[in-house]
């Protein structure tokens, strides 16, 4: 059944949180000073228009994506994360759900808590809050 040629569309509650994880961590891993890094992230975000596993979600994302010159935003993690924050907010509003973050700052704090290792849990490495978020 899953091997037939017809597409299998899935409800967002099944795949959504996993996509957000990949989107957010991809942006955090991007080097905004390196053009190839920005270009790959741009292509990744562009490709979501055609690969989201929900046709309605694809259509909504296409409309949202096409309103912005994504390449200009990719020179700043703050700007691209603000774009993601507004996308998430728009989705929740469209679905009649309360958005869990009252401000962009609360969203950033959540990202830091979820994805940035605490110093006591990590040996000295190139990953640090200062390096990753002071450039926002």
Task: Give residue spans per PLM region.
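Terminal, compositionally biased segments used for targeting/anchoring and flexible tails
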Residues: 1-136
